[in-house]
Regions:
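Short aromatic-glycine-(Arg/Gly/Cys) micro-motifs in beta-strand/loop hairpins
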Residues: 14-37
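Mixed-charge, Lys/Arg-enriched low-complexity segments
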Residues: 32-93
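Short, charged/polar N-terminal "headpieces" of proteins
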Residues: 1-19
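Coiled-coil-like amphipathic alpha-helices with heptad-repeat character
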Residues: 7, 21-26, 49, 74
Length: 93
């Protein structure tokens, strides 16, 4: 199974596995100087809760790329992003 959104792709190792391979969206600078967003290197063999934590951390980092934030701001954003991910199943109801 594959779970994919705009900023990540998670692929289950096998149908009965609890482990996932994860690709996160990364900003890369090409040799010609253009900047592109593309899925980065694969992180192998993560349980689903670790996949979610890495997605949240990546989203926070991308949203605050060129600025410093406080620990409180980081934790507030962490909570908001985790709620968004956790509530995806509720959005269809």
């Amino acid at each position: 199974m594959i779970i994919q959104e705009d900023d990540f792709k998670a692929e289950q190792l096998s149908d009965d596995s609890i482990f996932w391979d994860l690709n996160l969206l990364r900003t890369k600078k090409k040799r010609d100087g253009t900047i592109v967003d593309e899925l980065g290197d694969t992180i192998y063999g993560l349980p689903l809760d670790s996949v979610m934590k890495r997605i949240v951390a990546n989203r926070i980092a991308r949203n605050n790329k060129d600025k410093a934030i406080t620990m409180k701001q980081y934790l507030d954003e962490w909570k908001q992003e985790m709620v968004k991910l956790s509530n995806l199943s509720l959005s269809d109801k």
